[in-house]
């Protein structure tokens, strides 16, 4: 990037204060009116009026939200019952799904999902092992002759 001006430091060698007046006037936080957010209700009020929202003073005052720690946040990977029925049909063709008592047994965690939702229709009797399921999904699976079993699982 092209420099548009030469730094004044080069030409101020030996001048002791480099154009900042008395020694100490360019040190610490006194010359700038205080550290950080100091003075926004006093001598820096004009900055609040200029840059803050009218009436609220945002972003200088008030609460500013909350960022949930990653350790407790859950990354949901849902699947609808209609999509699950199609997946089970595909797994049945490949011979990768277990069948017990005329019902297909599916573990959603092994398939990469952790929640069952109620979108779509299901006509296969499926026993689903999942960490979480919606009420409508459970109703649709049971209506088709299947069952939903909630199992504890690590969400991450």
UniProtKB/Swiss-Prot annotation:
Domain of life: Archaea
Role: Binds to the 23S rRNA.
Alphabetical list of Gene3D superfamilies matching this protein: 3.100.10.10, 4.10.990.10
Region entry Disordered, spans: 1-35
Presence of the UniProt keyword Transcription in the record: no
Quaternary structure annotation from Swiss-Prot or TrEMBL: Part of the 50S ribosomal subunit.
Keywords assigned by UniProt, alphabetized: Ribonucleoprotein, Ribosomal protein, RNA-binding, rRNA-binding
Organism whose genome encodes this protein: Pyrobaculum neutrophilum (strain DSM 2338 / JCM 9278 / NBRC 100436 / V24Sta) (Thermoproteus neutrophilus)
GO CC terms in record: cytosolic large ribosomal subunit
Biased composition (Basic residues): 1-16
Protein name, entry field: Large ribosomal subunit protein uL15
Gene Ontology MF terms in the entry: rRNA binding; structural constituent of ribosome
PANTHER family linked: 60S RIBOSOMAL PROTEIN L27A, LARGE RIBOSOMAL SUBUNIT PROTEIN UL15
Family: Belongs to the universal ribosomal protein uL15 family.
Any single biological process term in GO: translation
């Amino acid at each position: 990037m092209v420099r548009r001006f030469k730094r004044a430091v080069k030409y101020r060698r030996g001048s002791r204060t480099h154009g900042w007046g008395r020694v100490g006037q360019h040190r610490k936080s006194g010359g700038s009116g205080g550290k950080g957010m100091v003075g926004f209700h006093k001598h820096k009020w004009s900055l609040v009026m200029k840059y803050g929202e009218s009436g609220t003073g945002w972003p200088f005052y008030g609460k500013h939200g909350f960022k949930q720690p990653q350790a407790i946040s859950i990354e949901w990977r849902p699947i609808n019952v209609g999509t699950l029925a199609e997946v089970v049909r595909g797994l049945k063709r490949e011979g990768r799904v277990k069948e017990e008592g005329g019902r297909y047994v599916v573990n959603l965690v092994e398939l990469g999902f952790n929640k069952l939702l109620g979108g779509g229709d299901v006509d296969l009797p499926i026993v689903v092992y999942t960490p979480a399921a919606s009420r409508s999904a459970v109703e649709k699976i049971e209506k088709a002759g299947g069952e939903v079993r909630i199992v504890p699982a690590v969400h991450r």
